[in-house]
């Protein structure tokens, strides 16, 4: 299944632009992260892994792609003391990030509104990270090539990547597109792409169970807050949210979708 670039971009912006509504807040941010905004499977666990994998400290500079509302940038800057840049394409998301973190520059992190396939940084970084962004990149290989170029020699890439299990169906793929606007490669193809651009030694951990757990939490919270959510978004939108979480829970539980945490270094 393939989709043209304009359709992909429009679909993804539709998803991201509503990521501060009560469904996300009451069923993801609050029950999973105590109100902090992490909108990918990696969450703060990916950031802690990155800190240990890289040995992050004040002497380092870090770059997040798809920085959303900025909470991950704040987490990395405050926990590890390094300088952080977050790049985000969505106008609404970058405005939310700046509203949430008005003192970011004094705390060591900044936000840039840009398309990561067109933007060029003015410096090289010690680490680049993102959660689930390869799945939504219009050209995975080009993005990986750019990231490799943006890293200093020995710099690290740490990501979570959602890939297709061997038994995924076209019906499953159609659901993923309708829900979130992305296509996914098989695991072997995704890892080969990462290696092909120059990242040879990959530290790969299967965290698919996290996808199951997250969607179970979404379902429990959706029913617990049903009255509030129906009042906020309507019964049809509430039901669609619940059905989406059920379907994603199934896809992860049956390993039609697989989630990987990956760390690697540029030579």
What spans do the regions from the language model cover?
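A short acidic, Gly/Pro-enriched loop at the edge of an enzyme's catalytic core
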Residues: 118-128
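Conserved alpha-helix/loop element of class I SAM-dependent methyltransferases that forms part
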Residues: 40-58
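Short alpha-helix
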Residues: 183-198
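Conserved Class I S-adenosyl-L-methionine
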Residues: 203-267
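Class I SAM-dependent methyltransferase SAM/SAH-binding core
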Residues: 69-117
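Short, glycine-/aromatic-enriched active-site segment of Class I SAM-dependent methyltransferases
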Residues: 162-181
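Conserved class I S-adenosyl-L-methionine
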Residues: 60-68
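A short glycine-rich, Lys/Arg-flanked "PGG" loop and its adjoining helix->strand segment in the class I
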Residues: 141-156
